[in-house]
UniProtKB/Swiss-Prot annotation:
PROSITE patterns: CPCD_LIKE (PS51441). InterPro entries: Allophyco_linker, Allophyco_linker_chain, CpcD-like_dom. It is a peripheral membrane protein. This is Phycobilisome 7.8 kDa linker polypeptide, allophycocyanin-associated, core. Belongs to the phycobilisome linker protein family. SUPFAM superfamilies: Allophycocyanin linker chain (domain) (SSF54580). The gene is apcC. It comes from Thermosynechococcus vestitus (strain NIES-2133 / IAM M-273 / BP-1).
Length: 67
């Protein structure tokens, strides 16, 4: 199964007292080859940035610490 292992950074807004603080959330996930374009659009619509993309073959959850 062809997959992409992507690392992305997405801003998440949290309210602290009365001011807004912008925090970035980094995450790594496996995305199937067929869903890559949709996932890329989703991250960019959220104002995120894709940091790294690797081609990954094998089963989901193996060698990524997601198991």
């Amino acid at each position: 199964m062809r997959m992409f292992k992507i690392t992305a950074c997405v801003p998440s807004q949290t309210r602290i007292r009365t001011q807004r603080e912008l925090q970035n959330t980094y995450f790594t996930k496996l995305v199937p080859y067929e869903n890559w374009f949709r996932e890329q659009q989703r991250i960019q619509k959220m104002g995120g940035k894709i940091v790294k993309v690797e081609l990954f073959t094998g089963k989901p959850g193996v060698n990524t610490g997601l198991a």
